[in-house]
Each structure stands twice: as structure tokens, then as C-alpha cells.
């Protein structure tokens, strides 16, 4: 099937993009990597009257760590995240998740910001950003605002992003001291959406957990943050007792639905096991291991 007719726009500046989005309102749709949007267009599940291609807008693919913040531009590609040595060493949960997004073709073109704006509950990036306590910079013609990841997702394929706004940047508190992370994903086959996935980010201080982030993928109407599990870890040595308690709390936070991929009990158990494995892997990385 071919997409419904649309008018194509290719702005060259952020200001031009925001002007277009302000004019078009609900009739406009932003095109980033296109790995989610283009299939929807072909199936006519989405039929916007206007497409606004932001790939020519400079500055949207930046990545830098400065003034205590890691800034990731919305057009930063999955493949670039996978290959970044800085991310692999300081934010391994990002690099590990990037390497498990779909397949090489999608990773080459797809963008972090586009995936987040699409807000598929089985998408990889939402849980990662929840674990990292990220916030998203949303810009419109009238100004900009920052929205915490936990407040950004409002349901399946639904976010706080307004039709006249552009997601321009993801901001993550810079890693401090000994940090570690992990992303574990269960899929039916390589390149598939997650049946269950768990993202973990840890910061350790004198053998104790200074901060912990745990995000859950594909076990709810949106990506979930296991806040009680995170709170249970803070200030404690990351021993087996702490890991097991956090894993139980993460499983309790999950809201899975039974489907052809597995029962509710099965998915909760995967959350439990992946949280245990993720915390142990993150602990080893925080200690300087692989």
C-alpha cells in the first residue's frame, strides 16, 4: 500500500521547523529517522497532510557531556550510540540498549529522539531514559520546556509532546564516581520488539548504592520506572539480599498482559530475573569489570 498524499517540508533551521509546526498544528508530523513513521504511512495507520523532515536541521545530532549534564540530540542515531566509546564506558546502559534496537538497517537510520516521541511501550529507549532519570527538552515557537522522562510518557504511543513542539534534546545527569549499567532484553528473534526488557543504571559510593535507576519495557501501557525497587537500594551495599529485594519490587511494579509472547506470570518472572542479572552486571561494571 502507498501512503496517502502529503506535502513535504525540509526546513534548514530549528526556527523554521518551529514556525512550520506552529502553522500546521495537528496536520503536521515530524519525520526523523522514519523507521517507525514510514511503515505507518505505508499502511495508512498515519495519514498526516504534511511531513516536516528535520534531518537537515543542524545541531540536533549533538552528544556532549558538559556542566554536569550529558546532552543527546534528538537526531542522534542508534548506531552512533552503539559505537560511542564514551557512552560504553560511562553510560553502558545506553550503548548496550542501542546495540539491541531492531536490526542494523534500523539502527543506521533510526534516531533516539524519534523512538522516544513514537512512545511504543515495547520500544527500547523509554526504559533506558527512565533508569537514567533523563529529561526531555521540548521546543515550540513560544519557548521551551523540560519534561522528566517519568512525566513524558502518558500511554501507548502517547506523550506530553504537543503538535507544535519539537523534541530537540535529551538531558541526563552526568555519571559521578563509580557507575555501571545494563540492558537486558528478551525477544522472540533477533531484531524483534521486546517481550520484556529491563534497564539498570547504578552509581556507587564506598561500596554502597548512591543512586539506582530501573526502567521496564513492554510490561505496561507505557515504559515503567520501578521506583520502589530503586528506593530499596539507596544507601545499601549491593549484596544478594538487596538485589533480590529490588528484583521482587521491580516484578511487582510490572503491569504485563498475557499474549502470544507469554503469560502475565512468565513476564513478571522475566522482570525479576533480568533485574537481578542487570544489577549484578551493573555492579561489576561499577567496580571496573566488563
Locate predicted features.
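C-terminal structural segment of proteins
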Residues: 1-290
